[in-house]
Swiss-Prot record:
Keywords: Coiled coil. The keyword Coiled coil applies. This is Ribosomal RNA-processing protein 7 homolog. It holds the Pfam family RRP7. The lineage of its organism: Eukaryota, Metazoa, Ecdysozoa, Nematoda, Chromadorea.
Amino acid sequence: MDCCKKKRVKKVAKRKSEKVIHLDPDALRYLRFRIGGKYMAERHMFLKKDPSKENSIIVSNIPAFVGEGVVLAIIDQFASFEVEESFVQRSNTADNSLSQGQLTMSITFDKPEAVIQTLALCQDVGPFTITDFLEDPEFPSVLKDSTTLYRKLFPSEEQIQEMADTYVERYDTEQTEARKEAKRKYSEPDEDGWITVTKAKKAAKSVKLKKEDVPLIGGLNNKKKKVDLAYYTFQIKKNRQEKAQELLKKFEEDRKRITQLKQARNFKPI
């Protein structure tokens, strides 16, 4: 879930808190909260004064799925001051992703006294429940994330077939365009205005021989052989059947070979 998305925050009745303020401005304070639902364990955000700005505080250990608006709504429960600016500074993840891990944000108030009151009262209130401040609470799920990652790493058979067909189609299109481009270049003049012309090879001349010059054709035996018509008809039928079976077998082999070639074409679906 993107932490930078605007969440729909509900209005919650403010809690009254009265306290005589005696505070070390450099002290690290905490604010108690719970997620809600079946996640009722107490957690803590940490607050401290921003040394670089008189009217700013730094809030850390914020779950990325909570959102900036929820933090502001919680602080407004016990320290109702106008906020001049707020933004997420960083995350504790290795890649500094603002959608994961624990976030640190900066809050700047209009008045410096807001900083003192916020830090003085934050430990005496709560724990606040996050789901009380959200109209449509949605939290990350390990099962959901694992399922999404599994589907990304291991596509289904239909997805793999679709990717393979797309790759083969694109490859064939590129090859066709390359042949057309090469053919077009041969018909275009070069820088000097010359056109490359290729000469086709002549077909070999046929050699005519007399039947007497080739004994295997019949030069040694001119007598006609008597053929049994019944046997000859049966042999023709048998030859046709054998030829049909050979063609069918060859067709199956070619089909398998084409399928293997498609799968072997430098295809990396992942």
